[in-house]
Structures are given as C-alpha cells and as structure tokens.
Curated annotation (Swiss-Prot):
Cell compartments where the protein resides: Secreted
Signal peptide as annotated in the record: 1-19
Glycosylation sites: N33
Keywords associated with the record: Disulfide bond, Glycoprotein, Phospholipase A2 inhibitor, Secreted, Signal
Subunit composition and interactions: Heterodimer of subunit A and subunit B.
Family as reported in the entry's similarity comment: Belongs to the CNF-like-inhibitor family.
SS bond partners: C22-C46, C25-C32, C39-C67, C73-C94, C95-C100, C120-C145, C138-C165, C171-C191
Molecular functions per Gene Ontology: phospholipase A2 inhibitor activity
Cited Gene3D superfamilies: CD59
Known function: Inhibits the enzymatic activity of phospholipase A2 (PA2).
Descriptive protein name: Phospholipase A2 inhibitor gamma subunit B
Tissue: Expressed by the liver.
Length: 200
C-alpha cells in the first residue's frame, strides 16, 4: 500500500514538473524559426499563426510561433479593419510536442474582404490614450467595435490606442491576453456590437 501511494505521489510530482516547451519566433514571410521556450503553467499548447497587414494595394505578411492556451485553439481566424484603409487578418493553428515539427505552415486564404454594411468608430493613436475618431466600414464577419488601449509598448510607443471593426474571435483572443509571450505590456480591451450607419 505504501509503495502504491509513493508511486502515485511520484507520478504527480513528475507531471507537475513536465513543462511544455514551444518554439518562439516572429519573422517576415510565411515561415519563422526560433529557440525553444518553457511555457507558463497555464499555457498548455503551442500556436503558430500567419498575419497579413493590408493597406491596398500593399500588404505585409509575417509568421509567429509562441506558447498559448488550448481554450483559444478554436479561434483560428481573426480580423480587424481600421482607419486609413488599414486591415489586419490572421490564421492560427495549435499543436503540441512532435506534432509541431510535422504541422504544415498556416496559410491565409485569399478572400474578397467585402463590406458588410456595418460601421464602428475608428482611430489609431501613438503616445496617447485618445485619438480623433472617424467612421470605419466593417468587412466580412466583423461584427464588433474594438477599443484597445495599450501601455508600456516600448518597441512602438509608451502608449497606443486602436479603435475599429473586429471579429468576435479577435476580441476573445485579446481579452485572454495571449500576447504575453511577446512582451510585458498592458492591454485594456473592450468590444461592443457594431451599428448600421443609418443609426448615426
């Protein structure tokens, strides 16, 4: 009986000590390579995502890998539409262990990105929590008005404010603070239902 209890306790300690490791990187293009990083206790999956920043006719694509939580894996596509004809969209995929070594690169499919008749107040401001709003037309499945205030963004500005249209999936990801692996910054995220232009 004692040996059985000892084995159970040993197994528990070993399980606790086995931390997940994920490759972490962020590079231009459709692939990226980085070093392995031990994930936090609450992070139980690795995630790879391809992101496209669009300001027609130009676009910029980069690929990222990091630790994440499995409760966000179903949020595999996110999109936002901002002022100045700026749009950002991303496709995500989760993996664990050897699966990450054989998983094909994430691919962002081409789509028409059509307007859906909904609108949100939008603005982009650096170095301030406020910015001059203008009406932004939403596209595709964007049905949320996003308001994001970031603090301690040392690599861009101390503070940043972003408002525009967003998908529900993007709101959920931002509210779960999934970007903690990239840097130590604070995000205040609020999302509200979009409104038709006729209501303005």
């Amino acid at each position: 009986m004692k040996s059985f209890l000892f084995c159970c306790l040993l197994g528990t300690f070993l399980a606790i000590g086995m931390c997940l490791e994920c490759e972490v990187c962020m590079q231009p293009g459709k692939r990226c390579n980085g070093s392995m990083m031990t994930c936090k206790d609450n992070e139980d999956t690795c995630v790879m995502f391809q992101t496209e920043v669009i300001r027609a006719p130009l676009s910029f694509t980069f690929t990222s890998k990091m630790c994440s939580t499995s409760d966000t894996c179903h949020l595999d596509y996110v999109e936002t539409n901002l002022p100045y004809e700026l749009a950002v969209r991303s496709r995500r995929a989760c993996c664990v262990g050897d699966e990450c070594k054989t998983m094909p690169p994430v691919v962002l499919e081409h789509h028409d990105n059509r307007y859906n008749g909904l609108h949100c107040p939008g603005c982009i401001g650096f170095g301030s929590h406020e910015c001059n709003e203008k009406l932004v037309s939403c596209r595709d499945t964007e049905n949320q008005c996003l308001s994001l205030i970031g603090k301690n963004f040392d690599f861009v500005a101390d503070d940043i404010t972003i408002k525009g249209c967003a998908t529900e999936s993007l709101c959920s990801l931002l509210q779960k603070k999934i970007f903690s692996a990239i840097g130590e910054f604070d995000l205040d995220v609020k999302c509200t239902p979009v409104f038709p232009q006729s209501s303005q």
